[in-house]
Amino acid sequence: MARPGDEHRGAECGARGGGWGGRDIEPGRTGELMKIGIIGAGNIGGNLTRRLTALGHEVSVANSRGPETLAALAEETGATPVTVARAARGAEIVVVTIPFKKVPDLPAGLFDEAAEGFAVIDTGNYYPRERDGRIAGVEDEGLTESRWTERHLGHPVIKAFNGTYAQDILDRHRPAGAADRMALPVAGDDAAAKKTVRALIEELGFDTVDAGGLDESWRQQPNTPVYGLREGVDAVTKALTEASPTRPEAFRG
């Protein structure tokens, strides 16, 4: 099983699903249709593309290799493959789901043409020994992972999906009120953006728990009790309170 928030594999790793553009749209959806840009088409990005198009949202998806490499995902889902520089154009929500170390490589002016009041979701995790190498902002300055990402992006971010198994996005969504409905922690400082993101997650079929501001988002980083937890609101709330701010040795660079 891939680790939670495993965003670095290709989109072909996800299961196939429905979409818009001549494809079936899931019945019983709630909320307004939105334009959503997804930067990263790995496990998380690919499966969010599948589910969001199935719900009727207009999705643009980009990766580092170019839109021509996303033809299969586009054909499957009806999403529009674009360059990274165009992914946020007109978007009301932008999902950044790329390897942590690649965040500084995103183009300047990425959000210049995003919709007014847009929200940014950060799904990333810092894996210094496996992939990312040592990053001083996290190791020396003590920034939370998403605070570091926010500084590079130059826009407030909402941390979500970083502890979610990608396949669960496809397989474990449930109607509101279902006894086995999973809850996901959501952290961030921008109250309006957090409200938007929580509503989207709930539409995707998961409850949400407010995990506090971005400086508290260490509570949902890798190797914390909530990371990878497949439980409901009460268990997720408890797990967040049990987290330690000390970064585990295995997750230090």
Regions found by a protein language model. Give the residues of each.
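General beta-strand structural signal in soluble alpha/beta enzymes
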Residues: P81, P156-N162, V209-G213
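Intrinsic-disorder-associated, low-complexity terminal segments enriched in Asp/Asn/His/Tyr and depleted
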Residues: D6-H8, D24
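Rossmann-fold NAD(P)-binding glycine/threonine-rich loop
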Residues: G124-Q167, R172-P175
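Rossmann-like NAD(P)-binding element
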Residues: G78-I121, N125-D132
